Amino acid sequence: IREEQAALPSAVRKPRDDEIDVFGLTHPGKVRDENQDNFLIASLHRQMRVHLSSLPALGGVTRDTDRLAFLAVVADGVGGGFAGEEASRFALESISQYVGDSAQCFYTADAGDDETFRRTLEAAALRVHEELNSRSEALPGRREMATTLTLFLGVWPRIYLLQVGDSRYYFMRDGI
């Protein structure tokens, strides 16, 4: 997990929801016919509000409360057949559930206590990994279930990146 805090002038404010422009799209690529990747773009209020996802079951909650955090997750299924898609779907659903359920911790979190928050994200990733392994062992023909996971969590003015596997993320600063 990596945490960044931008050196911001004091006049810079937290962006409003309508000032955040994001988009997600998945594609099967050139090798496989089936798409094994999934994504989620959401904001965390008192509950998670899904803005866009490749998974239709992750419906949005619409409440007009102050945004606590912004979440973007990509799960890139590994391997052929159904196992990669199922692994990426399961990982994305599980990690978003953990993050969404923990939204209340943002109200009580100490702004200077990043270590506790990092440990919580790491624990969530490990729980998803363990659950995916258990699921893989329990389902015949799914022993090779695997996925990468890249998670961005913006809690103004900090960002947290959780990287599991070999998928890349690109960090731009000052347009570069």
Predicted segments, located by residue:
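PP2C/PPM-type serine/threonine phosphatase catalytic domain
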Residues: I1-I176
